[in-house]
């Protein structure tokens, strides 16, 4: 086991626990404490910790799907933990060298999801610009040894086929340009909604070969019905995907949740699905489904305990200074050059702690 980028006192303590046979992996708990104690403040101008010798990509290499889990080059089950950007048409200023150094070397993240909205003043307005921005972020994440999820953030219209030709153009360009890298994951449909699983499946079976033609080895993430809820938000269940999977290999299915809105029914569906099909939580928050309002840390912790137990990777929404409670930074942080813990909202401090939990690579 490689404990990546962990302060020496933590590594020693963990080694001591292992030597006594004590369990250190988190398990699903129904008695999690809901409160969050803010981390000690780091001054605004304090530099991020220096890079360590082993990055997530160095430790794991090219990822692949093995059975119902994500595996590294050595065939070991791995869980990635990290953050999602907000829409890059609105918050590109939140992704710079300083913020990514903080994410990589202070938060100890493994992955960032690059959210390219299609509509809402996104990709469709300037395909060349947004494609170049994705490639720029991939370069920046690669320099820090992080994995990059290329998220085609379709949302409204909810039928992914509406943007099929745009998606083909986008993924061809990005995959062709980055096909020599071993740290790229493709998410081909953010939150399909208002259409059947069969319609979504048809889209996936058209777009997956487009990615495969340029990048045959990358893991591809597939959105599920009803805002990637496995159909639960439409009154269905995971069985529609389990019993009728996409005809493709090396793929995983996505699940999104917002803890203050999505309770036991959603958690149970995720748990059942993860035993049958490969799952990846590409978006979640501790707030309501709009990413705002009060935090429900207790319910969020139950989800993350399950994810740790079943090695389900996740990225949290979102790495920005948006006014909503789901953005990790306080307003005015991005572009300031200062991303210390005193710039974090309550949810930001909580998710930083979750990401900093030592990896089991």
Question: How would you label these PLM feature ranges?
Answer:
Residues 1-36:
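Secretory targeting and sorting signals
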Residues 14-15, 123, 161, 293:
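Alpha-helical transmembrane segments and their juxtamembrane interfaces
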Residues 33-111, 124, 357:
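N-terminal carbohydrate-binding accessory modules
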Residues 57, 61-64, 87, 92, ...:
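Extracellular glycoside hydrolase catalytic/binding regions
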Residues 72, 151, 283:
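Acidic active-site catalytic centers that drive phospho-/nucleotidyl reactions
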Residues 84, 118, 152-156, 190-192, ...:
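Short, histidine-centered active-site or binding-site loop motifs used for metal coordination
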Residues 96-157, 164-169, 212-214, 296-310:
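Aromatic-lined substrate-binding rim segments of carbohydrate-active enzymes
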């Amino acid at each position: 086991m490689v404990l990546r980028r962990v302060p020496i006192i933590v590594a020693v303590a963990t080694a001591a626990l292992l030597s006594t046979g004590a369990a250190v992996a988190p398990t699903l708990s129904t008695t999690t404490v809901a409160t969050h104690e803010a981390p000690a403040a780091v001054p605004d101008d304090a530099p991020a910790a220096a890079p360590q010798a082993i990055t997530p990509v160095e430790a794991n290499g090219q990822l692949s799907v093995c059975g119902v889990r994500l595996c590294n080059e050595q065939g070991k089950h791995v869980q990635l933990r990290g953050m999602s950007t907000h829409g890059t048409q609105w918050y590109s200023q939140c992704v710079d060298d300083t913020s990514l150094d903080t994410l990589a070397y202070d938060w100890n993240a493994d992955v960032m999801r690059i959210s390219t909205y299609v509509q809402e003043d996104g990709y469709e307005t300037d395909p060349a610009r947004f494609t170049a921005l994705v490639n720029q972020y991939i370069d920046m994440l690669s320099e820090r040894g992080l994995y990059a999820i290329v998220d085609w953030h379709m949302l409204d219209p909810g039928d992914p086929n509406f943007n099929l030709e745009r998606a083909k153009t986008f993924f061809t360009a990005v995959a062709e340009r980055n096909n020599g890298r071993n740290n790229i994951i493709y998410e081909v449909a953010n939150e399909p909604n208002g259409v059947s699983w069969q319609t979504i499946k048809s889209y996936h079976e058209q777009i997956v070969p487009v990615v495969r033609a340029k990048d045959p080895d990358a893991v591809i993430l597939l959105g599920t019905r009803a805002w990637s809820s496995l159909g639960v938000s439409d009154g269905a269940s995971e069985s529609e995907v389990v019993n009728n999977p996409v005809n493709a290999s090396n793929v995983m299915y996505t699940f999104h949740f917002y803890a203050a809105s999505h309770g036991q029914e959603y958690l149970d569906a995720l748990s059942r699905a993860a035993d049958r099909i490969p799952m990846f939580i590409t978006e979640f928050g501790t707030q309501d489904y709009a990413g705002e309002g009060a935090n429900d840390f207790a319910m969020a912790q139950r989800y993350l305990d399950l994810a740790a137990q079943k090695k389900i990777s996740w990225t949290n929404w979102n790495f920005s200074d948006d006014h909503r409670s789901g953005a990790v930074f306080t307003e005015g942080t991005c572009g300031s050059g200062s991303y210390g813990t005193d710039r974090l909202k309550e949810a930001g401090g909580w998710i930083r702690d979750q990401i900093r939990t030592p990896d089991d690579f």
